[in-house]
Amino acid sequence: MLKNKVAIVTGGTRGIGYAVVEKFLQNGATVVLFGSRQETVTKAVASLKEKNENWEVSGAWPTLTDADAMTAEISKIKDKYGRIDILVNNAGISDSAPIEKYTADHFSKIMDLNVNAIMNGILPVVEIMKQQGGGCILNTSSMVSICGQPSGVAYPTSKYAVNGLTWSLARELGPFHIRVNAVAPGITRTDMVAALPKEMIQPLINRIPLRRMGEAEDVANAFLFLASDMASYVTGEILSVDGAMRS
């Protein structure tokens, strides 16, 4: 499905991002995964190579909030492979602090990584995709961008900004054959969720009509569909993968 495609996946060392990287590799893509630290990036790449030594996977650890660092790293990837077909903006941080615990710096930190950093990847990639005649940009949103959450206001705010960015860029970049979509996961079995107390998790599962948590692979399958030619006429969509929890 992704043979001869070159993809960048930010936040690709664990959880949903790692599952997306693996799914893309299974379907023939060449993938460069971005992570925050050299150690975790190296470990993730080695883990994937152990699964299949023929997979074309490598890693990098640019500071996502540094526009110059991102431009430089993306330029290296373009020089090495000749093109960039897919950008997955998956890196981000969550938040559950009540409003009385907030500071301006706290809010800005979350917005910086969850929104501003996305643009640091999109801007150089868009120029490359325009030159090559098209491409695909995928963003990780969240169920709470649609329904909100009772605390941690910065996180749903940042993810709603991701939705707006997705809708607007889809309209602007469509004439250049660049598709822009987002995936909005619900409660997904990741390290972060697994660390929650069981007494907190079960009530959440009870609210999901399918009566189970999502798996990282469920979300990765949505990314695969949107990245593939099966979604060649799909752009400007926020694809919910939440078991109808938000309904």
Pin down the residues of each PLM region.
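Conserved glycine-rich cofactor-binding loop
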Residues: T13-G15
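Conserved glycine-rich Rossmann-like NAD(P)H-binding loop of the short-chain dehydrogenase/reductase
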Residues: N27-A44
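Substrate-binding pocket helix/loop in short-chain dehydrogenase/reductase
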Residues: P98-I99, T103-M111, V193, L204
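Active-site helix of classical SDR
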Residues: I122, S158, T166
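Alpha-helical segment proximal to the catalytic Tyr-Lys
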Residues: E127, R171-P175, S232
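C-terminal substrate-recognition "lid" of short-chain dehydrogenase/reductases
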Residues: G134, R212-V241, R246
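Residue(s) in the substrate-gating loop at a strand-loop-helix junction
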Residues: S142
